[in-house]
Amino acid sequence: MTALLVAGAALWGAAAGSLLPRPAHRLGVEPDQPWRSADPEGRPFTGPARGWLGAARGHGPATPQVALLTALVCAALAATTGARPELVVWLLLAPVAVLLGLVDRRVHRLPDVLTLPLAAAATVLLGLAALVPGHAGSWTGALIGELFLGGGYLVLVLINPAGMGLGDAKLALGLGAALGWYGPPVLLAGALLGLGLGALYGLGLLVLRRAGRATAIPYGPFLLAGAFGGLLIGGLGG
């Protein structure tokens, strides 16, 4: 049963991940620019979802790598969560999280069109999961985690706006809901892991003289990695 569950999650992740390069390319623009509507040769995007889903051959993230990454993320979540209701939530949110990481890594931007729906979806879907027998979390904990992590990052943004952006705080809303589902220890572990990974990356750049103190780094991928680690811990302990 577990092997089939993990295999199914991996197949879902691979299929969903194969559709992410196109939106990653289209959304990977500076804040003052519109979303891309054509490839570098000027050909308008066509295909599923009005050209928003699909590969981005020669002008975006490589499809095999993105599909593999998403498959591994989904498989790991299935292996640790098991056949519990919240696994459906994690598998639905995982491709969006991967997409956010791709965009932020590319242009240091976390678009509202992704972060806010992610937070809303996490809240609603976990509320539904809480109604299904066999779950291992708390919807109240998810709401508290959402407010705690989102509010915490908002404070960090206000203290150091050059180091983090409002996009990080908006992303933290959805991640806080997911981590808070498993309770305060997992919420704290995921939050600290994300901050720690970002700090280590920044320190490494300074040591290698590849960045200065004022250099902006994309925190989104590290926040996502921290939340992913927290969910693995929560799944194992649930």
State where each predicted segment sits.
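A membrane-topology feature that recognizes alpha-helical transmembrane segments
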Residues: M1-G238
